[in-house]
Amino acid sequence: MGSDTRHETATAVADHLERLGHTVVRCGAVGGVDTPWPEAADEVARLVAQRAVDTGVVCCWTGTGVSIAANKVPGIRAALCIDAETARGARRWNDANVLAIGLSNTDARSAERIVDAWLETRDVDPTEAENIERVARLEQRYTRRQR
C-alpha cells in the first residue's frame, strides 16, 4: 500500500486491511515518508510484479498519476477505481493487480468499500482470458522495442 502524501483516506485503507487480517507493506507516505507519486507507485508495483505481495493499492490526489506510473512496471495492470463496481470489474474482466484510488474524491468509508470489493473478487471471467492475454502480448511487444 503506497501513497505520495499522508492522507486520512490512505491511512484508513491500510488500517482497514490490517483489521481484516492482511499483512500490509506500507510504502511512501503510508509508511511515514512523503514520497513523489511516481516513486510510491513504483515501490508498490515492483512488490506486486515480483510476487512479494498478492496485490497492491496506490493513492495520490486524483489516482491517475499513480495508476500511470504503476502501469510502467512490466506485469502490472493498475486500475483507477472510483467505486466498488469498478473495482469488481477491474479484477473480473481485466485481471487488474494494483488498485489506484484518488484521495481528492474518495472518503475513507468509500475507499474501504472499494478495497473490500477488490479483495472479494478473485476469479477472472474465463471469457476474458483471450483479451487479458492480448494485453500481455502488447506489453511484451512494446517492452522489447524499448530495450
Predicted features by range, described:
Residues 34-45:
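Helix-loop module immediately N-terminal to the HCX5R catalytic loop
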Residues 23-35:
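A short beta-strand-loop structural module common to alpha/beta enzyme folds
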Residues 1-20:
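Glycine-rich phosphate/diphosphate-binding loop of Rossmann-like nucleotide-binding domains
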Residues 12-15, 68-72, 112-113:
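Short amphipathic alpha-helical segments
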Residues 20, 73-74, 94:
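Short, structured coil segments at secondary-structure junctions
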Residues 43-80:
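Helix-adjacent hinge/juxtasegments
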Residues 2-8, 84-147:
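C-terminal binding/interaction regions
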